[in-house]
Amino acid sequence: MEEFPGYFELDRSRQHDFLYPLIFRESIYALAHDHGLNRNRSTLFENEVDYDKKYSLIIVKRLITRMYQRNHLIISANGSVQNPFWGHNKNLYSKILSEGFAVIVEIPFSLRVLSSFERKEKDIAKSPTLRSIHSIFPFLEDQFSHLDYLSHVLIPYPIHLEIAVQTLRYWVKDASSLHLLRIFLHEYWNSFSTPKKHITLFLKGNSRFFLFLYNSYVCEYESIFLFIRNQSSHFQSTSSGVFFERILFYVKIDHLVEVFVGTDFLDIRSFFKDPNMHYVRYQGKSILASKDTPLLMNKWKYYLVNLWQYHFSVWSQPGRININQLGKYSLDFLGYFSNVQLKSSVVRNQTLENSFLINNAMKKLETTVPILPLIGSLSRAKFCNALGHPISKPTRTDSSDSDIIDRFVRICRNLSHYHSGSSKKKSLYRIKYILRLSCVKTLARKHKSSVRAFLKRLGSELGDEFLTEEGVVLAVIFPKASGRLYRGRIWYLDIPCINDWVGDAEGSIFTK
């Protein structure tokens, strides 16, 4: 253990994160707002008295005070709240409090992020394309073709409130704030959760607060896991650790908590010897890929299960971690179906006397668009029926023609932009056809005309509007090839965040 003293010491600055006084400091909220830490939450700083319409610092203060006054929170046997202050607005007040807690608890972390960004500004400027979600796919194309086994891991969530609070103890050394957080979670947990949903970390009404709790849990888990991986591998990891989603992408995990108490670390390190292990996390899941035998993958599998069970008190069955051969498994990853296929390459060898062909088999990562889930999403958004036949949108007939066309064109281009890396473009053309014809039917319904007559009157103008972005880009880069259909894959390096619609049947892309 003497070899790694730096890994098991907390940053001394973290020992002075006293957050409790910040709850009642209006200047702290203004500071957070000025630093851009609370975007799209400007209403939190408006001191209005209309509780049903505005978030305000005054409301947060009052609610925190009443949380400590236990006589105001007496609940009768039938579950109704006796105090008229809470009444039927208890869910609203819990949301307001969660917003206030999220702002405050992010302050010490976010200020360190800003200072880290200033130190690493030059390095970030050299590699701006790493911000893109699509940047992971070229990496997978280069690496997965040389690997044999893949383990798909579903990261378990801490189902007990105390686990989330205890995880924060390693990062926030303020007992008063943690005590207040514990009271808040126990008082309002029923407001957040529903009987049908046991995992409520990503409820839309409280996503910011619970996203912070979830990321703190994942950060500690990955700190331990990546430390073991780096020390057991022949090659040190060069990846950056992620704490806040899309905020701390470039921040290295420099400080780890002490977790190997009473464990012979050298034995653990010698237990996992893999020269080529890769780790990717996305949407509450992670991927482990290796070139070695399934025995090593099983070792990592049971190590993760024991780590979650004994360190985080989170029960995870080994069956939640699947080990598959890359050549026989299709991975549903970030809106794509990805699998490794053997592609034959024929080379003709000519000698002085003979000529013969050499057939070389090469592994290649194929990415395709999941057409059925996309059609299902379009059907639920009323762009087509269950069979994929386009229908009109009656809710849009009150808008102007330009607004209707702009909406459909924006949706089409968003889909084309993200799914441009598909190996098979035919399914993507079908999605474009559904959106284009749905737009025409909506306009024809508005003008009380037939689709044929409306298309004849409109001409080719609508087709030019639906010209996708990759078509414009290719026309500039490859002017000679722009006339014929381009079937290659395009990965855009300007997608900094992933929208909810990727992997979600009822995504926000259809409502924007």
Curated annotation (Swiss-Prot):
One of its GO terms (cellular component) is chloroplast. Keywords: Chloroplast, mRNA processing, Plastid, RNA-binding, tRNA processing. It is found in: Plastid, Chloroplast. The keyword tRNA processing applies. Its main location: plastid. GO terms for biological process: mRNA processing; RNA splicing; tRNA processing. InterPro entries: Domain_X, Maturase_MatK, Maturase_MatK_N. The keyword Secreted does not apply. GO terms for molecular function: RNA binding. It comes from the Eukaryota. Usually encoded in the trnK tRNA gene intron. Probably assists in splicing its own and other chloroplast group II introns. Belongs to the intron maturase 2 family. MatK subfamily. HAMAP family: MatK. This is Maturase K. The gene is matK.
